Amino acid sequence: MPLIDIYCVADHEFDETMWVDGLLTQGEVGIASVADMVAKVQARCAGGDRIRELRVFGHGDEWGQYFGADWVNEQTAMHRFRPQLEQLRGLFGPGGFMTLGGCDVGEAAALLRALFAIVGVPAQAFMAKQYPVFPGDEGRRRRCSDRCEVSGSQAWEHVDTVLDPLRERFHRKLQGLRDRF
């Protein structure tokens, strides 16, 4: 039973950040909601493959993260989305884990603990802004299973000063493309 990585990117509406992330990620799975993500992950594992890493990329903050159009925090994970998320149990291989790729989601320790309790594998996220055009994850990592641990270094402090002019240029070009069509 091969171990696979699954990279889910919110695609419920057009968003420049998600679009760039999807463009730079080969084989990403576009997701519209928690239910959509679960169904697509189950389909990817239907042949017997098991998950090494399930990475979910969506906008986030210190309280939670979007899974497509669904806002997932500790409360919604434990109540509203629990029946759907529980369907991921058993799809992970040995050492499998879940990564949330939204900005500052590593601060949401309660959410990470809730995901561990529901899905049954460690859940991790990073404690800084995340940028799809830079490889790797930014900031310290919080990984929660039966307990939470923080490791790693601080995020690049210079990233915003480098990215802000690039973002502005990118948005102008993108707006120009939109205006043409």
State where each predicted segment sits.
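Short, solvent-exposed polar/charged micro-motifs at secondary-structure junctions
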Residues: 16-17, 38-43, 64-66, 134-138
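Solvent-exposed, well-ordered amphipathic alpha-helical segments
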Residues: 15-29, 46-55, 97-99
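Short amphipathic alpha-helices and their capping/turn segments at secondary-structure boundaries
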Residues: 34-52
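Active-site-proximal C-terminal subdomain of hydrolase catalytic domains
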Residues: 98-181
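Catalytic cores of nucleophile-dependent amide-cleaving enzymes
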Residues: 53-57, 62-135
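A domain-level signal for caspase-like cysteine endopeptidase catalytic cores
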Residues: 1-40
